[in-house]
């Protein structure tokens, strides 16, 4: 638990929603305390909070109280809010939704805090999205086996594998036919582990693998950010391979 009072804590605004006629409930991803829910009293109308509590805003937040909802007592800018539009905006909401769905409140993950900001600034780069997904699962204790196969042998870049989500990659003796399970090349696994650049044919393979892995923990409830992307994709400018709709 974070205690009764926390002062000037670096945090990102993930989400906001109305609470009473004048206040807001704000979901923050803080550096040292993890995901925090807080009530910003007067947040819907007061000039005090204007422009500070929008999603993707980096803030220095101060709050007090215990329990599920703290009381936000102050916030000030902590840098520029990334200028996201089109597919980059939809991808940003996808990142936020992953954190809201997968992180428990008051569960610190300081290693993810700077990675989140770096990923926002790289959107809509698909390799950045896959990297964030992979590091998020690792932080939660659900990391994928990427450097060794099921038999304990090192993964080889030119080899082909069938990935079993509960056990890891199974090396295949021959190039497999499409539709024979979750197929991936060793190069893609090494790229997700950070050993190679994630590009070219590895991108769709990584997308399929990460989508399957995340689905184990997201459950059956659809991601709202995918619906947002479908709306944005109706205009040609918004269409991009990095869309959350492809996850």
UniProtKB/Swiss-Prot annotation:
Q: Which UniProt keywords apply?
A: DNA damage, DNA recombination, DNA repair
Q: Which Pfam families match?
A: RecO_C, RecO_N
Please state the span of the N-terminal signal peptide per the UniProt entry: none
An example GO CC term for this entry is: bacterial nucleoid
Any single GO BP term: DNA recombination
Family label: Belongs to the RecO family.
Please give the name of this protein.
DNA repair protein RecO
């Amino acid at each position: 638990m974070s205690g009764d009072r926390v002062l000037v804590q670096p945090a990102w605004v993930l989400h906001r929603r109305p609470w009473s006629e004048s206040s807001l409930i704000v979901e923050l991803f803080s550096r040292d305390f993890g995901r925090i829910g807080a009530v910003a009293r007067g947040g819907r109308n007061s000039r005090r909070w204007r422009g500070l509590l929008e999603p993707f805003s980096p803030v220095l937040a101060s709050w007090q109280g215990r329990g599920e909802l703290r009381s936000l007592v102050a916030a000030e800018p902590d840098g520029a809010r990334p200028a996201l539009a089109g597919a980059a905006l939809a991808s940003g909401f996808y990142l936020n939704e992953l954190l809201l769905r997968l992180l428990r409140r008051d569960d610190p993950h300081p290693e993810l805090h700077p990675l989140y900001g770096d990923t926002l600034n790289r959107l809509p780069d698909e390799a950045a999205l896959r990297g964030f997904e992979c590091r998020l699962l690792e932080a939660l204790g659900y990391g994928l086996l990427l450097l060794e196969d099921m038999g304990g042998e090192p993964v080889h870049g030119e080899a082909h594998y069938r990935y079993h989500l509960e056990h890891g990659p199974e090396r295949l003796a021959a190039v497999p036919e499409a539709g024979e399970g979750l197929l991936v090349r060793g190069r893609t696994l090494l790229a997700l582990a950070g050993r190679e650049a994630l590009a070219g044919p590895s991108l769709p393979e990584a997308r399929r693998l990460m989508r399957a892995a995340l689905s184990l923990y997201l459950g059956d409830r659809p991601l709202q950010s995918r619906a947002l992307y479908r709306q944005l994709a109706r205009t040609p400018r918004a269409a991009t391979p990095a869309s959350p709709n492809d996850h």
